[in-house]
UniProtKB/Swiss-Prot annotation:
GO molecular function: RNA binding
Entry keyword RNA-binding: yes
Regions of compositional bias (Acidic residues) in chain numbering: 250-260
Protein name from the UniProt record: Non-structural protein NS2
Originating gene: Segment-8
Record field: compositional bias (Basic and acidic residues): 178-196, 237-249
Region called Disordered, residue ranges: 163-196, 229-269
Amino acid sequence: MEQKQRRFTKNIFVLDITAKTLCGAIAKLSSQPYCQIKIGRVVAFKPVKNPEPKGYVLNVPGPGAYRIQDGQDIISLMLTPHGVEATTERWEEWKFEGVSVTPMATRVQYNGVMVDAEIKYCKGMGIVQPYMRNDFDRNEMPDLPGVMRSNYDIRELRQKIKNERESAPRLQVQSVASREESRWMDDDEAKVDNEAKEIIPGTSGLEKLREARSNVFKEVETVINWNLDERDEEDRDERGDEEQVKTLSDDDDQGEDASDDEHPKTHITKEYIEKVAKQIKLKDERFMSLSSAMPQASGGFDRMIVTKKLKWQNVPLYCFDESLKRYELQCVGACERVAFVSKDMSLIILPVGV
């Protein structure tokens, strides 16, 4: 059984100071300023002293066809010296004057008590007289330049467009994994993440960089784990970092002494290790379950966790392709964004190059 549409009661308070309409005459005979028209399952009207909360106050100069437009709510009224007609349904055979609504914060007396209430004020001009026939036939097609009549009626055309839209292939703009990651970002991080996705070079750029720098840097497979539960372990980590930097520096010196033509054996700098150590010590909940790992000259990752806006100097810079989940060393320099990615159960921190 088809369910009936629920009807909401609308209260219109007609203010006709000249008493040229039936509403104004009834209000004047009762020594009241307003005539209330209540539209619901039935239509009723009576003189009242003041409007009610959430009511429409329609100020009119005299008889006319008025249509109150409040968003999707439309109320059509015919006010004449001898009668009143009103409806919230479609009423298209007559012309109406469209009246816009202005919400106002007021104090009115309601049920014997002064209350703060919102009323909606609208003013009609009386430019459309009651019961003026609408000469526009909805079934006729007007002569419009550049417009031809369709072979379908309006319902068939809408159904045709709907079927074409549903049958058309849809491109997946954002994966489920990306949406899950965005839930853990604040507004600034999400904005930076979107900017990083726009700037990240495509597959062709990544392949060119891989060919150009394939013989420049060697992979570094050293993995450093930080355990940050106790302060004494933090001190040991700092000492370990210093020893590793010293070892890497010695290796660089030996490489330079051996031959001036050989390239550096590692792209990991002291500044990078210090910055990474500080990020790990922040104990971000998103990284607590992951152990930290040094990035290789090129490699892959499982997922992007977050991109932070950080300014680092003298650090290895990477370009990466999020669709292929690959990253590639670009050079050593300065960055303004740092990407945090995960591979297996390891956290990899990648400064983003230009």
